[in-house]
Amino acid sequence: SGSCEVKTCWRAMPPFRKVGNVIKEKFDGATEVEMQRIGTRKQLVPKNPQFKPHTDEDLVYISPSPDFCIRDMKAGVPGTAGRHCNRTSKALGGCELLCCGRGFHTAEAELVERCSCKF
């Protein structure tokens, strides 16, 4: 008589927040690189020679992201001037971040609406 053993292995994704944190960390430490010919091969090397060479685990980029604060329709960036923002928020829609340090104007408005409330 023989015995049979079944072994099942699987991999699971870590929590989404953990994945996001790792990507953000890599983004913050990303290195701008350029293509250089070294001998007969082309290689990506840091644009700033003071930076250490990147590893396979590092995030690199060839051209910097556009300045999303400034309007650049060629790059498809509408800019942030004139947008409404949340004065009390410190998050993405907050005025401090959305207005890119240009300052902002506040305005208060009172809105009176008729509603079909039944009590």
From Swiss-Prot:
Swiss-Prot/TrEMBL keywords: Developmental protein, Disulfide bond, Extracellular matrix, Glycoprotein, Lipoprotein, Secreted, Wnt signaling pathway
Lipid positions (O-palmitoleoyl serine): S1
Any Pfam family hit: wnt
GO molecular function terms noted in the UniProt entry: cytokine activity; frizzled binding
GO cellular component, one term: extracellular space
Post-translational events: Palmitoleoylation is required for efficient binding to frizzled receptors. Depalmitoleoylation leads to Wnt signaling pathway inhibition.
Similarity comment text for this entry: Belongs to the Wnt family.
Protein name listed in UniProt: Protein Wnt-4
Species annotation: Eptatretus stoutii
